[in-house]
């Protein structure tokens, strides 16, 4: 059985590294430190030009929960259309109602826009904050998504193994379960063997020092605990290590 490896990235350097490491698909985001937000149109367009493998854009207009207002929804619709215009192959989204159920009317609306633009759809980890994952599985099957990205309702996919295995059974081949969050070369094979998933999702994250010669530590561009002179990047060796381990 061939296992698909999806790598989430938030910069073009990481895109090159993910491809070099053997990724099968890219989840394109901005701000992975916030869980992944919508990438810019320029980022989408350049990724489409570079990548020989499918690229799916995250459609998440802000950090926080998955309950969106009309302005958020309008932005999401425009971003789905932008993904098509940029030349990408798919999008990734997830929307909930205030009670934690899948927002089916909105999901169906976004799904139609994606389908009309010939874009594949992954339903993302909003399912990990839903009220009833078994009901959500049926909702997502009804929508016609290709897959669900999930940690099995846990902090990481390894801790969610039992729920992931149940999700695979409930999906019953109607769509794929994409196991993600904390997947590494050390645990990927066990996650696959114990759950039956055919796809895994990881960042293979590492860092590199800035190439700046002038370093002004006293000036911060964001949160005080972030070092602006350390650049987060995907490590191609970590992706390859996972690929070799799960052969």
Curated annotation (Swiss-Prot):
Q: Where are the transmembrane segments?
A: none
Q: Does the keyword Cytoplasm apply?
A: yes
As recorded in Swiss-Prot or TrEMBL, the protein's gene is named cutC
* Protein name (database record): PF03932 family protein CutC
Q: What keywords tag this UniProt record?
A: Cytoplasm
Q: Where in the cell is it found?
A: Cytoplasm
The molecular function GO annotations come to: copper ion binding
Q: Which domain of life is it from?
A: Bacteria
What is one cellular component GO term in this UniProt entry?
cytoplasm
């Amino acid at each position: 059985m061939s296992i698909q490896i999806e790598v989430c990235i938030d910069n073009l350097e990481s895109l090159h590294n993910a491809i070099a490491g053997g990724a099968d698909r890219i989840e394109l985001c901005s701000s992975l430190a916030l869980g992944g937000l919508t990438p810019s149109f320029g980022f989408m367009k350049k990724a489409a030009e570079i990548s020989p493998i499918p690229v799916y854009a995250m459609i998440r207009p802000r950090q926080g929960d998955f309950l969106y207002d009309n302005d958020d929804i309008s932005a999401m619709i425009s971003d789905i259309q932008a993904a098509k215009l940029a030349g990408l192959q798919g999008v990734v989204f997830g929307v909930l109602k205030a009670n934690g159920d899948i927002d089916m009317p909105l999901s169906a609306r976004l799904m139609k826009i994606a389908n009309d633009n010939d874009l594949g759809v992954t339903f993302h980890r909003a399912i990990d904050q839903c009220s009833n994952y078994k009901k959500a599985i049926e909702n997502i099957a009804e929508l016609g998504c290709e897959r669900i990205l999930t940690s099995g309702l846990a902090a990481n996919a390894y801790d969610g193994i039992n729920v992931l295995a149940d999700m695979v059974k409930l999906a019953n081949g109607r769509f794929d379960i994409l196991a993600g969050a904390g997947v590494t070369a050390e645990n990927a094979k066990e996650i696959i063997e114990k759950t039956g998933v055919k796809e895994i999702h990881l960042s293979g994250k590492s860092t590199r020092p800035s190439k700046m010669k002038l370093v002004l530590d006293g000036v911060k561009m964001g949160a005080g605990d972030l070092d602006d002179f350390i650049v987060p990047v995907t490590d191609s060796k970590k992706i390859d290590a996972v690929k070799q381990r799960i052969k």
